[in-house]
């Protein structure tokens, strides 16, 4: 069954037979057609949730927020190759963490804007500004959530993540990068590949 989400230009594909190897609730984007058959790109899983306080951020909300921040990178000739997320409650208050793998798209004599703290901090606030009212209230008013953090990881980190999860039983044919991670070994792997850490420089906009 196909259910179009027109406002996001996404399609949700539901197949209990497993024919297309997607889980019930996966959100897909139609990227083209082969004859009359639609071709899909996996976007996210609908029901995965990040939560620190009363906030509840599902995977589609996170995807939409990251998409906004990606545009900042693309305008500076950088490409977000992969990402995932977790909540870090080792700090008080806890906060959202995004793991990003980025590469430069500069070619030839095209000058690249340095991938510096200011650029990554602007991505942090772009993500937060795109999250929902409850998250922004918790951040800006209640102070029950700390500033969002982006951790850059070295090239190949997400390939290593796939190898780890497949070794733990995930099917390599059906593997999709999880957008929210709770597994201790997976988080330890990603944290061991971190090359830089950047936090949102201010509170997101919030009004009563």
PLM ranges: what are they?
Residues 1-208:
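AMP-binding adenylation
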């Amino acid at each position: 069954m196909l259910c179009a989400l027109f406002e996001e230009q996404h399609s949700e594909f539901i197949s209990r037979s497993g024919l297309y190897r997607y889980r019930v609730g996966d959100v897909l984007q139609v990227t083209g057609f082969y004859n009359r058959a639609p071709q899909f790109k996996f976007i996210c899983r609908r029901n995965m949730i990040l939560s620190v306080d009363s906030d509840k951020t599902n995977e589609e909300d996170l995807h939409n927020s990251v998409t906004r921040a990606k545009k900042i990178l693309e305008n500076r000739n950088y490409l977000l190759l992969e990402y995932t997320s977790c909540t870090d409650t080792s700090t008080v208050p806890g906060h959202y963490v995004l793991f990003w793998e980025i590469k430069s798209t500069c070619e030839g004599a095209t000058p690249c804007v340095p991938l510096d703290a200011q650029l990554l901090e602007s991505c942090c606030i772009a993500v937060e500004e795109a999250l929902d009212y409850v998250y922004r209230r918790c951040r800006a008013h209640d102070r029950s959530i700390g500033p969002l953090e982006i951790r850059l990881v070295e090239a190949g980190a997400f390939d290593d993540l796939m190898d780890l999860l497949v070794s733990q039983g995930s099917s390599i044919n059906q593997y999709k990068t999880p957008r929210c991670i709770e597994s201790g070994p997976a988080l330890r792997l990603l944290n061991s590949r971190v090359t830089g850490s950047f936090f949102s420089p201010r509170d997101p906009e919030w009004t009563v």
